[in-house]
């Protein structure tokens, strides 16, 4: 119930305080996070990875000023929308959503998958995405060992 109240406040803010462009980005991000979450839960990873891009390749490291502005707008839309989704929208959902939204706008990205062990010696997985020289979601992977990367 608490999450619904937060979602309604966010929706009210979205309706009255944001530009039409931002409203469309937030709406796109909201629905895409749901689609990506569904894919993660219901599609075997062997099939899902084919949708992530070219395995073990990197995207270009330069961005134009216009591309940078688009990247930051999409980043903000996805990160902020992910706080209010009724489903779990963590790193992989966010990375896949950003990748899809930027790819739709002809901006290439590299999606990284990494692992490390926490203080209890438990394996932890993480996903982050880079566009140009900007780490868009998930930070720069810091302490995670990269096990796969996909360029799209």
Residue positions per predicted region:
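A sequence-level detector of short, solvent-exposed, charge-rich linear segments
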Residues: 30, 46-50, 54-55, 93, ...
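Active-site neighborhoods of divalent-metal-dependent phosphate/nucleic-acid chemistry enzymes
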Residues: 83-84, 88-93, 97
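Short, charged low-complexity intrinsically disordered segments located at boundaries
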Residues: 59-65, 69, 105-113
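N-terminal accessory/pre-domain segments preceding catalytic cores
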Residues: 1-63, 70, 79-87, 140
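Hydrophobic/aromatic-rich core segments of domains that either
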Residues: 77, 96-152
């Amino acid at each position: 119930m608490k999450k619904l109240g937060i979602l309604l406040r966010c929706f009210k803010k979205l309706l009255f305080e944001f530009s039409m462009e931002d409203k469309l980005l937030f709406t796109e991000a909201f629905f895409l996070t749901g689609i990506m979450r569904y894919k993660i839960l219901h599609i075997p990873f062997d099939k899902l990875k084919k949708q992530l891009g070219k395995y073990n390749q990197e995207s270009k490291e330069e961005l134009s000023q216009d591309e940078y502005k688009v990247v930051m707008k999409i980043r903000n839309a996805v990160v902020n929308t992910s706080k209010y989704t009724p489903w779990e929208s963590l790193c992989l959902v966010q990375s896949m959503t950003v990748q899809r939204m930027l790819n739709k706008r002809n901006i290439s990205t590299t999606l990284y998958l990494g692992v490390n062990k926490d203080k209890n010696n438990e394996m932890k997985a993480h996903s982050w995405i880079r566009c140009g020289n900007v780490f868009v979601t998930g930070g720069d992977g810091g302490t995670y060992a990269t096990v796969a990367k996909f360029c799209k």
